[in-house]
Swiss-Prot record:
Coiled coil region boundaries: 72-152
The protein's name: DNA damage-binding protein CMR1
Top-level taxon in the UniProt lineage: Eukaryota
WD repeat ranges, renumbered to this chain: 218-259, 268-308, 319-357, 361-401, 418-456, 495-538, 542-573
SMART domains tied to this protein: WD40
Chain spans, region Disordered: 27-94
Bias kind Basic and acidic residues: ranges: 79-94
Keyword Transmembrane helix annotated: no
Family indicated by similarity: Belongs to the WD repeat DDB2/WDR76 family.
One GO CC term, this protein: chromatin
UniProt-listed InterPro entries: WD40/YVTN_repeat-like_dom_sf, WD40_repeat_CS, WD40_repeat_dom_sf, WD40_rpt, WD_repeat_DNA-damage-binding
Sequence intervals crossing the membrane: none
Amino acid sequence: MTLSDFEKQRQENIQRNKELLRQLELDSLNDSISREVPKPKPKAKRRKTENARVKTEPIMPSRRSRRLAGSTMEDSEEDKQMREEMEKAEERKRELEKLKSTRLFGDFKLIDLVVNKQGEFKNQDKILKAKEKDNEIKKEEKEEIKKEEDSTDSIDLSRDNEVLQKLQQLGDRFSAGDFYEMIKDTKSKYDDTVLQEKREEFDRVKLYERFDPLDIKITQQRITSIAFHPAKDDRVVVAGDTTGYVGIWAVDAKGDDETSPHITILKPHGKAVARILTPEQQPSSILTCSYDGSVRRLDLKRLESTEVAYLQDPYESSDYPLGVSDINVADNNLLYMTTLSGNFYRYDMRSPFKQGELLRLHDKKIGSFSINPNAFHQIATASLDRTMKLWDLRNISQKNSYWSEFDDKSPHLYCTYHSRLSVSCVDWNHDNHLVCNGYDDTVNVFDLSGSDKLPLVTEWSKDYETEKKKRTTIEDGVPEKLEALTRIKHNCQTGRWVSILKSKWQLHPADGLQKFVIANMNRAFDIYDQKGRILCHLTDPDRMTAVPAVSMLHPTENWCVGGSASGKVYLFE
């Protein structure tokens, strides 16, 4: 068979490549490489060494028979005494932890309520016994209390006593007449020129520089309420937290130790302190209310803490407190209170407290309420039920509670504002403007000073009602038509670890410009006028490390203070 031309060419290429390889001597090189590679030598076998056995002691049973152990069935006197002391110590510890969350009974000196850095009473034994009711204290225990009162000097209270003495001196210098200019109405018209001047004035306000804000820890836990005392020369800031502690900071106090702020922490309550206020005609008194159901007065002159009122559920057989959510004072003697259950109560502080009939304002928690400073019979309430309501206390009847699931009496309802989510707070100023905010991320300003739609709020009769729908359901029968003058977008989503944001008016602005403050979640304060125009955004990013959620303006001066979740305070001056 003859080969094709292509096959012939392929055979020639093969022969030519072989000849080329032979000339290069690659075959011999390959053989030499294979000869130079040594064969691996077998590894020497090593003798295995056995691990030394560790001698283990037999495990003894956790419980052994006394008979096998050779001991007697009865303990010695020393063992009995030691066991009894341990049991008493454990019982005392449990009792103290339980009593920490209960309210105080009776009157105390402020020095007795001082706590240490761990939040424990420095006069712990005295408070533990005093929290028991008088009829449960034995004669021997009363003698022990008297001895402990005599031995108070042995406890180191020098620093706390120094702060309280400064507060006492401060209280002695207060008179109601000193605040006449503050109390009388200061109404003045202003235009954009005044607005610009105010913004420039607030631009000069700076964070307090005498101490680092991280050192101004005024309470043990998250701050839930704060108050700025009306004094201007010797300023005082008071704050309460979630566990009943109340801290007092003498801002301008000076002493031998200038390395730390002058702060004293007390514990007058067993649960969260909901509100702190100073009555206008009694500047030496500080009122506090708590979820433990009590309202107490701190007297800066006498340095005493006394119980003003205590609310309990009338439908419960045992002593079941009604948590007080907010308080306000009308006409210097009338104390108004709201509860976590939606109740309202009035009490004349000139007479001994005896709980009377509770009024029904909401079926859910009232988070905040405010009195019209121009008409004490009118109040506004903000509730968890997503409404803000206006009431007339002159007209109280069971018929007025037609909207409620309960049969309690209610005041006359003027009108209602409905929100998408719960309303956190409401506040009333001297120009008949309301401000409220809630979890719908808005701040609403209402003008009730008289317009074409609504007459002046102080002229409303005791049966006045705004327009309402034809009543087919309970909700339709409630008067509505309360529209906001201004609606401001504001982030109010505080979450679990930050206190609820609440907008508050300045009580008696010395400059005549009505303004309110609300904390900003970006660690700042926002201040607006009553037309909803922002005046300033107070912040210090380098030194403010937390949200000053609970905020307040000084009653007259343009100073702002706020408390954080860690118990620290930020002051702009």
